[in-house]
Curated annotation (Swiss-Prot):
Species annotation: Caenorhabditis elegans
Compartment annotation: Membrane
GO CC, alphabetical: axon; cytosol; plasma membrane
SS bonds (residue pairs): 52-110, 154-205, 248-296, 338-393, 446-495
Gene responsible for this protein: sax-3
GO biological process terms, semicolon-separated: axon guidance; cell-cell adhesion; dorsal/ventral axon guidance; neuron migration; regulation of sensory neuron axon guidance; Roundabout signaling pathway; sensory neuron axon guidance
UniProt-recorded name of the protein: Protein sax-3
UniProt topology in membrane: Single-pass membrane protein
Domain Ig-like C2-type positions: 31-127, 133-222, 227-312, 317-411, 425-511
Amino acid sequence: MFNRKTLLCTILLVLQAVIRSFCEDASNLAPVIIEHPIDVVVSRGSPATLNCGAKPSTAKITWYKDGQPVITNKEQVNSHRIVLDTGSLFLLKVNSGKNGKDSDAGAYYCVASNEHGEVKSNEGSLKLAMLREDFRVRPRTVQALGGEMAVLECSPPRGFPEPVVSWRKDDKELRIQDMPRYTLHSDGNLIIDPVDRSDSGTYQCVANNMVGERVSNPARLSVFEKPKFEQEPKDMTVDVGAAVLFDCRVTGDPQPQITWKRKNEPMPVTRAYIAKDNRGLRIERVQPSDEGEYVCYARNPAGTLEASAHLRVQAPPSFQTKPADQSVPAGGTATFECTLVGQPSPAYFWSKEGQQDLLFPSYVSADGRTKVSPTGTLTIEEVRQVDEGAYVCAGMNSAGSSLSKAALKVTTKAVTGNTPAKPPPTIEHGHQNQTLMVGSSAILPCQASGKPTPGISWLRDGLPIDITDSRISQHSTGSLHIADLKKPDTGVYTCIAKNEDGESTWSASLTVEDHTSNAQFVRMPDPSNFPSSPTQPIIVNVTDTEVELHWNAPSTSGAGPITGYIIQYYSPDLGQTWFNIPDYVASTEYRIKGLKPSHSYMFVIRAENEKGIGTPSVSSALVTTSKPAAQVALSDKNKMDMAIAEKRLTSEQLIKLEEVKTINSTAVRLFWKKRKLEELIDGYYIKWRGPPRTNDNQYVNVTSPSTENYVVSNLMPFTNYEFFVIPYHSGVHSIHGAPSNSMDVLTAEAPPSLPPEDVRIRMLNLTTLRISWKAPKADGINGILKGFQIVIVGQAPNNNRNITTNERAASVTLFHLVTGMTYKIRVAARSNGGVGVSHGTSEVIMNQDTLEKHLAAQQENESFLYGLINKSHVPVIVIVAILIIFVVIIIAYCYWRNSRNSDGKDRSFIKINDGSVHMASNNLWDVAQNPNQNPMYNTAGRMTMNNRNGQALYSLTPNAQDFFNNCDDYSGTMHRPGSEHHYHYAQLTGGPGNAMSTFYGNQYHDDPSPYATTTLVLSNQQPAWLNDKMLRAPAMPTNPVPPEPPARYADHTAGRRSRSSRASDGRGTLNGGLHHRTSGSQRSDSPPHTDVSYVQLHSSDGTGSSKERTGERRTPPNKTLMDFIPPPPSNPPPPGGHVYDDIFQTATRRQLNRGSTPREDTYDSVSDGAFARVDVNARPTSRNRNLGGRPLKGKRDDDSQRSSLMMDDDGGSSEADGENSEGDVPRGGVRKAVPRMGISASTLAHSCYGTNGTAQRFRSIPRNNGIVTQEQT
């Protein structure tokens, strides 16, 4: 330990001695610069220091500027340049000198020296900072639009160092780094994007460096805001005489000026003015002529703005012609005129006082006697006593309602006690409701009795039937026979038995349906199934308004037990016909109420079972009701009370219908208010124009007078209704008040109630299945058709599939199904209301037996001519006419083609115009000796398409035969008239030589690869060389000219491979270049994958582009000298006298005879026929439909759903040509009902609302435009 300390001390003493010796020797060494001067920038008049340090410290320091010694305080006492003890040069006040002289600015260095030597430091510059006064670009006043970009320009004064630019707004520094909309450009410009009104103000540009700062002149930024609506005018609906205000408020900077104009009409200046506070346009005392469009214009320096609103003027209905009272003898005709005007045009109806039935325009009763013309005239023919009463004509629109009443009095001969009453004819057997198949026959029996024998006539929907129709005949018994039924034969048929004593009627419906529908076909039972006649009714008790009857049941009940009885009566005081008692009668005794005092009555009874109605009993004795006591006094009081109530309820509109709101597909809620308090209102009738409810009611009775809203249910889905409310007073007789205004409403959509039609399931092979269908009828869609849902259920969960298509799809194809497995398939339509009912469950077993059955059915369907001839509804003459027209078209086309090319008829060559380019006036036919070895040529009839590596773009799928179509029928364009112009094929640069498919038409390749969802994507990937759209010049001929065209051009069918040979090598084409391929592999137990095929039409220019080319000619390439000189042969010419010489000399002589200026070639426009021929039955997808079947410009197939319009094997599409929503499927406007007899049969036609007794219903909406069209369906 001691030795270590001793050693350490010794080392330290040695080091100390060495250091001391070195320091003493350093003063004896040459100097060394230890601190060099650095660049300095200083402003004029400021001090500055240039440092310089050297070792040893005794070294002399000398300063130089720009290579010259610096005069310091050592040389000149009063110099402002001072050398410090450390050697640094201190400038007390930097001088800029005059005109650059005596300036302190320059390059400085110091020199350290002693007797041992000297050393020079690095140079350091002293630069003078400066900042000029004037800005190179001064800010200017800027006006900008709000929301756009504003630029305040500024270029700072010249200075050194470069001045830093900042900005002030309203004398406050802008912190641009904290303002995201502000940007300071490198050149000093201030950019505000987007500019806002808050940015308005005074801006100054500030330039700073070490010299100081410069502030620019102030510049004003004015931000103008374009006019913007705070409140746009809205459409207004007002009543005549009211005032209306169109509120139009606009903001902007400066405040916009507002002006009003009326579109295409003068402004009602005497009644229109700008409201206070400039709130809008106000029109006083609105008139119907004021209806129109009013436009609010707002304008300021930043721009203009306009908005319009429509004024709809409502005027309640008023009568131009009121109905007048009439007195008509029995059997005569009563006519009531009724004309109303209003804004909008009022809807009107007739009703008989005391009855709920509404008779709208075009109404025809079941017996045809009562009619309402489209103009509103009510006509009652063959007037009867029962027609007597008051008839009300009511008009209504959204503004209000009005009504007028007229009385009908029927005069008849009095029946005395000595004059026996002879009842009208009685119909023994009548027809029943029937549903029959199209093409079958119908017999409608009508056997009547009476003295004298009554005549029988028939009506359909209230109109006489045309017996002259060869299909319709009437038997001697009165029965109606209709052969070969058609759908227009559907309707309500009424039999009328008439003699001099009166008439009787019997009505029932006949419905005709296709065999493909799901309707239940019902034919009328044999009359032996009906009950026999009950016994003659016995009158037990008679009062002034009631009669009690007793009778016995019939001896035989027919094919079933008696379910009830029907009572009919005849009154000579009420009219010469039988009337029905509407009540349900279950027993053999009944008290009839509501009869008229002092009236005579006669009764008959009919029994009814579930099969139908039996024959009538013997009529009862004639009975007369009694006259009640104090009848006169009560009548006067009642009449007075009724008159008061009627005046108060009908003189003005008491109810205002405010809103009708849709609740769901079958229910709506009505809201109404009383315009004034009326104590006589005891309830309301809610009525409507539209289909009846499902329970056949056309109105709703609201019995509480305090109720102000009500839900009407059991309506039809997706149907338009027009509702109104009628108040009533329930006194001795019910009095109906004036109806309210009317309002329209559309019920919501519901799931389709009908399944898709014509669902077909067909096996293509043991693993492929095709499902096709047609859309259901329009009246069963219950909304807008959105598509279809196909459910496929296998025997294992991974074999199930749920496919959803759009509304235009008509089929799907399932691939890679499991052989031997049983699949259950359901197809249903869907709307916005949901998925509807399916067609049922179809089971398919994927085995050989099923396949053979399906293939046999397919072969039978392919016999198109056989099916056409056997269609009973297609006359042979139509087929002959079509064939004649077809032949005439072909002859005309051939004549036209020949006339176009008449100048080349002497040539033996064939004009080729199938995608090649017309290059010269007289080129000789050029073809390789071995075309199979020359990659430039390819038979135009074989439309193949190869990819870049030479392999076909068509690849085999597991079921290749499903995709292969024989292309022998689409042999290009080889057969063309002769012409002196000859053509070369245009080579496609960059592609294989034999890859020509009718020129360079753009090819689309469908990819039926499996997918797990219902969205399919169209593959548009193409080889790069297919995108080359340039025309390429033809290659020069390299072989001798043959004496005639090669055999393969003369007969394009020669040497063509068979279909099987092409299929075997994996190559084939479909529809002229449309290829199907699959990628990947599928396990046998994988879920079924679907594919839907598109049929793509090529555009007329052959490039695959979607540009329409109507009458456009292709511009040919510029001709060169080589186009007019025949190429030299590649082989020696043949011996003299060969036909080659004759051809060549002839051609050369003709060429020389043309002179120096060759004749211009005549170029045919590239026709559609020159490109890929597609299957004549093929159509573009429904998304690409356009004129000529070409896709719209700039549009692509909708890839969201590739459900296709697949073609049936018989050439037809499984989808209707029109869209599903376009189908005109009539909805039966008449509800099927049990047969009706007598006058109450007219209730069958109460559902015959609207025009021609049909429902006003929305038809399904078309997909191209999205507009709802309302029409009678």
